[in-house]
């Protein structure tokens, strides 16, 4: 399998980034839902948010890499069997997912740094608090973060259902390409 995308399939880097992000986003969603249920006396009360913040910073760095990679190695064009509505919807959904991911990561940063303290990333390095206002910043960003998280999950579920629809009903290569296979790509 090639590193870069071809006209018929995604390369291993794009596929890896896609699935790592899919797993990480759902893991972060689950971690976020779980950590807000913890009581002060729970052993994970302080550890879970620190883990959530560290992974969030890593995801922001990964998202920048992903956007840069998308420009270096553009995705394959939509199959010719896709109509205009399908092509426009796919582009809009991808733009929305990227925008939502950036927004959720920024809102997480605003929650985490509202008290003026940096974010320690697994104890390896700190991300400084550049915008901090302990007043309403954390609460406002928290509400935004929650709504964005649900939006990402809902849109990504629709994204997955669309891929399954293409695979099962339309019987095209949309899903196969993101799995590293394509019947229209003569073995390359």
Locations of regions flagged by a protein language model:
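Membrane-embedded alpha-helical bundles that constitute the cytochrome b-like, heme-associated redox core
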Residues: 1-188
């Amino acid at each position: 399998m090639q590193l870069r995308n071809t006209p018929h399939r995604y390369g291993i880097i794009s596929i890896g980034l896609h699935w790592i992000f899919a797993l990480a986003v759902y893991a972060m969603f689950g971690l976020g839902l779980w950590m807000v249920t913890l009581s002060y006396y729970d052993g994970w009360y302080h550890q879970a948010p620190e883990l959530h913040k560290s992974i969030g910073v890593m995801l922001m760095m990964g998202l920048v890499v992903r956007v840069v990679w998308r420009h270096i190695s553009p995705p394959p064009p939509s199959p010719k069997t896709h109509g205009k509505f399908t092509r426009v919807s796919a582009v809009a959904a991808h733009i929305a997912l990227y925008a939502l991911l950036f927004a959720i990561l920024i809102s997480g940063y605003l929650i985490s740094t509202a008290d003026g303290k940096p974010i320690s990333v697994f104890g390896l390095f700190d991300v400084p608090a550049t915008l901090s206002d302990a007043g309403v910043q954390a609460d406002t960003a928290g509400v935004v973060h929650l709504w964005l998280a649900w939006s990402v999950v809902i849109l990504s579920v629709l994204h997955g259902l669309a891929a399954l629809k293409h695979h099962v009903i339309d019987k095209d290569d949309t899903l196969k390409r993101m799995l590293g296979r394509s019947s229209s790509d003569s073995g390359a």
